[in-house]
Every structure is written in C-alpha cells, then in structure tokens.
Design a protein with these regions (language model features):
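Structural motif
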Residues: 47-54, 94-100, 149-159, 213-227, ...
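Short loop/turn segments that connect beta-strands within beta-propeller blades
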Residues: 57-60, 101-104, 162-165, 230-232, ...
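A short helix->beta-strand "capping" segment at the edge of beta-propeller domains
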Residues: 1-22
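Repeated scaffold domains used in trafficking and secretory/extracellular systems
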Residues: 17-32, 71-84, 114-137, 182, ...
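Short beta-strand elements that form the blades of beta-propeller/WD-repeat-like
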Residues: 31-44, 79-91, 97, 117, ...
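Beta-propeller fold detector
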Residues: 7-12, 63-69, 107-115, 169-177, ...
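Blade-level signature of beta-propeller repeat domains, shared across WD40, Kelch, NHL, RCC1
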Residues: 301-332
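Acidic, serine/threonine- and glycine-rich low-complexity intrinsically disordered segments
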Residues: 123-133, 137, 141-145, 151-162, ...
C-alpha cells in the first residue's frame, strides 16, 4: 500500500472558541499556498447564540465570516459549497448567500423549488444537512433528511446554480437504491445513509455509511460503500463495498468524505479496528488505498480535504483547537 506524506505549510491558532468542522472547501486550484489559494471551513461559535462561521484560510491568516442569526434554523443546516474563487452557503432550502470578491457582502440568490405550488421538487418535510459536498461545476449535490429526523441524511437533490445569471433551482429529490448493496437490510424501508456527495466530470458519487438507525458510535455500522449513482439514486457502479460489519460481533465502521481531488478520505469510527483508528485515502480512479502520514507533532490532527498538493487538517479536542494547511511531500 502506498503512503502519502504531508509537510506543514502553516498552522492556525484560533482566537475564538468553535465547536467542530462541519464541512470544508477550496477556492482555487494550486499546488502551493499562494495568493488566491484559499481553504474554507464551516464551523460554529461555542458562545451564544452559536453563530455559524466560515473561516477563510490563506497565507495572510484567517478571515472570519460570521453568518447571520437567520442561519440558525432549527430544522435546516447551512450547506457550504465553492465555485472557482467564490463560495456559497445554502440557507434553509430557499436561498444562497453567495460570497465573491473580498467576501464582505454576499449576494442573496433565491432558489426555485418547482414552478407551481403543487409541483414542488423538495417536499415540505425535507431537512437540509451540512454534510460535505464537492462539485467541479454548477451542479451541486446536497444532502437531505425527511420524515424521521436524527441529524442524518438518507436523501439528496441537485442544486442547479448559474453564477452569471444569479439563478438557482432544485432538480429532483431521491434516495439511493437500497437493493444494490449486498448487505442491505430487507427488514426495513430505511434508505442508505449518505456521508458525502461529489459531482465530477458529470459523474455523481456517493458514500454511504449503511442503514443502521441506532447509534453507530455505540453499536457500529452494518456496512459502508462507495458508488457512482444517477441523479435518481440508481447505483451505476460500486467502487468500494465492505463486508457485513456486524457479522463478526466486533464493532466497526468507516465514514467517508469526498475532497477536491481524486481521493476519498476514510475515517474509522473506532481506534481498535484493523486500521488502528488511522485515516486512509481511497483513489476514485485507481481504486487503491493510501496511508497518510501527518507532519511531526500533528498526529492528532484529522485530514478534512485535499486540493492539488494542498491538504486541510484540524485538531479537535472538546472543541476545534487548531487548523493546519499542509503540502503533499510525496507518495511512497
């Protein structure tokens, strides 16, 4: 198995107290940290009222963009996405706060949900979830939950976004095809959970962490898988699929997060599994695993995103403590 080695470019100490990393992004392709190469991180203030904040990381430091109290929706999470050198935050299914230039004042772009009241794309009971989404264009896959609300995602849709015309609309609302996975549960109608989504070269990827409704931190997952899917949720190809994880009696599970690169980040739930709690990467093209070696003194950091040779890491210890921008030194 190959190994990806990281070296530290810059470490950021946080002046304010934040909860944890909701999702991340990158604003430009770049092999080194330079003017215009910036990383994004969606988090939330610990102190009341707990405002959501986008941290923009560059060689000059951290720019904090606090989202308004109207983003504190009890039902819907904000969703971060990037497009070239700009980014947007989807608010409550209805509009996009679109940040350009110096990000000081966002444009508000409404999202159309069908053209007639009786033909809405998103059902009323759909709830927006923050899980990391990556796209190389203007079609942004977004995670949702409906009917039963655990803060998870079992549904998705596509946001069709036109940054030139300042228009956006929802396209479709689907679940991932359950029966396509070897270890699906016939006893329930629960659709596979969605950890992360990616649209690249007109191909839609989804990572599912199985179907279990119970606490995976307590009981483990039933299975996990990576697949190419259609916008209607049909599984076109499985790139990765685990065994039935509960068959051996040992708790197990792996979460997946797409990046702005060919790699999917795989994060095990438990430290006593076969991976010893260490993250791995999975190449979407080569379909091979890669180990990750963090820079010295940063072994407790977790990897959250990759773009070119840039890697975004963060340290969580009862709150978000530290953020790192690293460079890929090489692959051995």
């Amino acid at each position: 198995m190959s190994t990806l080695k990281l070296s530290l470019i810059q470490k950021y100490k946080l002046e304010n107290a934040y909860t944890y990393v909701y999702s991340t992004g990158f604003l430009s392709e770049g092999s080194i940290l330079k003017q215009g190469a910036r990383a994004l991180l969606l988090t939330r203030r610990e102190e009341a009222p707990g405002a959501y904040t986008v941290l923009v990381l560059s060689e000059t430091g951290i720019q904090e963009i606090e989202l308004g109290e109207d983003f504190l929706d009890r039902e819907n999470d904000p969703v971060l996405f990037s497009y070239r050198d700009s980014f947007g935050v989807i608010k409550a299914k209805k509009e996009i706060a679109y940040f350009t230039g110096d990000f000081s004042s966002p444009e508000i772009i409404p999202i159309k949900n069908g053209f007639l009241p009786f033909s809405k794309v998103l059902p009323e009971n759909a709830r927006e979830r923050y899980f990391q989404t990556v796209s190389d264009g203007c079609l942004i896959p977004v995670c949702f939950e409906k009917e039963v609300y655990y803060g998870l995602s079992r549904c998705f849709t596509i946001l069709d976004f036109n940054p030139v015309k300042k228009e956006a609309k929802w396209k479709g609302f689907s679940e991932i095809e359950k029966n396509a996975f070897t270890h699906h549960d016939n006893r329930t109608k629960d659709a596979p959970k969605i950890d992360s989504l990616k649209m690249a070269n007109d191909v839609l990827y989804a990572y599912t962490s199985g179907e279990s409704t119970g606490s995976v931190n307590k009981w483990g997952m039933d299975y996990y898988a990576l697949a190419k899917i259609s916008p209607e949720g049909k599984v076109k190809e499985k790139l990765l699929e685990s065994e039935q994880l509960k068959a051996g009696g040992k708790k197990s599970g792996v979460n997946g997060t797409f990046t702005h690169s060919d790699y999917l980040i795989l994060t095990p739930l438990f430290n006593n599994d076969d991976w010893k709690g260490k993250q791995k990467l999975f190449s979407l093209n080569k379909r091979e695993y890669t180990d990750v070696i963090m820079p010295r003194g940063m072994t407790k950091h977790s990897l959250h995103n990759i773009c070119g040779e840039l890697c975004l890491t963060a340290l969580y210890d009862r709150g978000l403590k530290e953020i790192g921008l690293c460079k890929i030194e090489g692959i051995e």
